[in-house]
Each structure stands twice: as structure tokens, then as C-alpha cells.
């Protein structure tokens, strides 16, 4: 969810940026995941298309959305007797929506895909809250959710700070990047 939001926000911010700034703006997005080495090995220089493809679809990227959703589905299947049927239905539905998404449409408008993933993730969290007994398993899910959020927040701040600190303080690009940071 956080990764797709980051992609959509930065995609829109970089549309308004100068061409050279837009080209440089994609690298920090990969840096948020900590997979810049793998990205460079596969693609070389970051472009909008290569970053979106890497972060959403590339099966070699363990942090790609498709990889995360696939693992979540496999994990849910392995504990299916301990989760509610609604939880299984939500994660399964999200898996098929991500797997079957029109990749060309996503490349043109990552925002719609971000909404799809966000709705799937939040729907899963909602049915978890309302259908799972609030015991150890529930607390484990909540702990994982909060750890993931804290990790992504610190990575986003570090990557954006490194990029923004190299820009002139008065440039419009700095303002665009600060707005993107707040929306991420």
C-alpha cells in the first residue's frame, strides 16, 4: 500500500518537474526499498518505466508489489484454518487484481493502481479487525503492520532528504519534492 502511494504521488510530482529533475527523481524512489543495487544490476539508470516495472511487477524484486501480495497470499493459505474466510477472500481477491492488472494502463496512470492496492490492503485490515479474535494472532498482525509502517516512513524520509538536500533551497523542484514527501 505504502509503495504504490509513493509511486503515484511521485509520478504526479515528477510530471510537473523539469525534464532533467524528473530523470533524477526516480532513483530515490527505488532507494526507499533499499533495492537500489538490484535495480541498477537489472536496469541501469532509473526511468519512470523501469522504476514502476521494478517496484510493481519484477519477480526478481522481493519488495515488488506482486512479490509481496504473492507472499501474503501464500502465508494466508498456510494459516487458513486460523484466519477468517473473509480475510482469505480479501487477500485472494487482491492477489488476482494485482496479477491481472492492465500493466500498460498502470504505466500511464499509477494512481488508479495505487487505489486498487490501497483498497485491497485496507479492506483486509478492516475484515481482520472485525472478524479475527483479538488474541495473539491479531496482535502479531498489528505488530507487523506498525513495524512495516515505521520502516517505510524512515526509508522515505531518508531517501527524500538525500535528494532534496542537493537541490537549491529556492527552486520550484524543491517545493514539488517537499509536497511529494508530505503526500507520500
Where do the language-model regions lie?
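Alpha-helical transmembrane segments and their helix-helix packing motifs
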Residues: 2-184
Amino acid at each position: 500500500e505504502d509503495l504504490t502511494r509513493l509511486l503515484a504521488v511521485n509520478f504526479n510530482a515528477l510530471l510537473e518537474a523539469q525534464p532533467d529533475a524528473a530523470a533524477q527523481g526516480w532513483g530515490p524512489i527505488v532507494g526507499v526499498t533499499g533495492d537500489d543495487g538490484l535495480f541498477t544490476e537489472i536496469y541501469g539508470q532509473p526511468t519512470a518505466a523501469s522504476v514502476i516495472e521494478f517496484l510493481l511487477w519484477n519477480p526478481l524484486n522481493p519488495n515488488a508489489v506482486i512479490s509481496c501480495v504473492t507472499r501474503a497470499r501464500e502465508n494466508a493459505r498456510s494459516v487458513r484454518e486460523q484466519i477468517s474466510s473473509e480475510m482469505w477472500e480479501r487477500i485472494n481477491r487482491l492477489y488476482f487484481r494485482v496479477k491481472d492488472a492492465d500493466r500498460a494502463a498502470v504505466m500511464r496512470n499509477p494512481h488508479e493502481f495505487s487505489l486498487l492496492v490501497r483498497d485491497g490492503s485496507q479492506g483486509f485490515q478492516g475484515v481482520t479487525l472485525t472478524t479475527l479474535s483479538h488474541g495473539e494472532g491479531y496482535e502479531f498482525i498489528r505488530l507487523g503492520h506498525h513495524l512495516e509502517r515505521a520502516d517505510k516512513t524512515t526509508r522515505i524520509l531518508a531517501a527524500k532528504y538525500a535528494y532534496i538536500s542537493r537541490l537549491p533551497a529556492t527552486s520550484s523542484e524543491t517545493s514539488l519534492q517537499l509536497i511529494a514527501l508530505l503526500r507520500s
